Amino acid sequence: MDLYYRSTRSDDVRVTASQAILKGLADDGGLYVPESIPALDASFEELSGMDYRQVAYEVMKLFLTDFTEEELKACINKAYDSKFDTDEIAPLVKADGAYFLELFHGSTIAFKDMALSILPHLMITSARKNNIKNDIVILTATSGDTGKAALAGFADVEGTKIRVFYPKNGVSPIQEKQMVTQKGKNTYVVGIHGNFDDAQTGVKNMFGDKVLNEELNAGGYQFSSANSINIGRLVPQIVYYVYAYTRLLADGEISKDEKINIVVPTGNFGNILAAYFAMHMGVPVNKLICASNENKVLYDFFATGTYDRNREFVLTSSPSMDILISSNLERLIYMIAGDDAARNKELMDSLKTEGRYSITPQMREKLSDFYGNYASEKETADVIKAIYEDTGYVIDTHTAVAACVYKKYVSDTSDKTATVIASTASPFKFTRSVMDAIDKAKYDSMTDFELVDELSRIANVTVPQAIEDIRTAPVLHDTVCDKTQMKDVVKKILNIN
């Protein structure tokens, strides 16, 4: 059966999966959502005998119904190959009373690789299916990880150009070095004076700028997005939650139909929304635990039913979650409003004009699957140190936020359910913050790359290739602009007057 996609802001939009992937964002500013969430048609017994690529096909075929089996399998096989440093793709590691789902074994050592390894192939296939002759310009805002993963995915992909904007002072030194050393004749990286929300708003405004889009079209280009607003990012992320459940079953850690908790550190809400979709596909989930850092806008939303971005933006040691405008939450709002696009648009308009909105008591009742909490900077550092000292396992700052919130959840509920924690980045990506947490006095005087070697030694883990590659790599991108100049920069890069 064919599955179509609608906009969260209008009942008039109905497109195929490939059209939604190409567009990224609907013309009305809404996000694409499937008309329904399909149920898995393979049993967990069957899925437990499959490898990651096979599970990916079983999940993604249900959402991308206008792709042939051959097309989809080709995309999957090109994505999940030797770019990942383990055949498992997303291994589970048991530590500290939970199962850490390691999503950082791809080419840029962050969970964004899980979706951005396949998105370029989905996009090129979609363009072919829809007879698109224009070059596709990927426009992306990043809080650190998406940018590098998107650059790596799209570098030198025929028929595409990628433009990444990041907050100049809002990413880790390693994250910045990864981006500004990116090779590829179709890549361009720009730092902005502003925060991630400024970058994301600038990108969204360009998508919605009719005149700019007409100018692009005349120049033989069209925009698409590699951010998690693109359904082609969200669908591949569902896979690893289904896969994690099958691994727990296959390893005898849980029994048939036993429920699990899933903890996700999140700012833009895409990664936990994928877990919500997995639950609705049939993965037995007891609780979805939403972990925030000190930018706790999502925690406050779950606690009060009011989303309010009118607050101070905090720069934390988990920069990929330093977000006050959580784009993917809109998809959840639309769904708990009963697919009411008009109601959702009203709330999103309120967010744009007043910086806040409140949902109804009836909508709040539909959030009972979620538990939200947050971790302070001190709590985050304390958890990294405690888990390392107790187990020898080293986690990054974002994963530590999740581990801390999970401890708070257990303290609040005494729930003993088996729990998967999404481990979203390698500790090597945030080496200084991680080593400061373990022993600041000891490591404070070391350089970033000395810390990398020391982390490798104490964790007994080989330095990832992604880090080795940037030790001596030259800076290739040094453009910096004001947040108000983003459109001008894009036009200049593309030679559009």
What does each model-found stretch correspond to?
Residues 1-497:
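PLP-dependent amino-acid enzyme catalytic core
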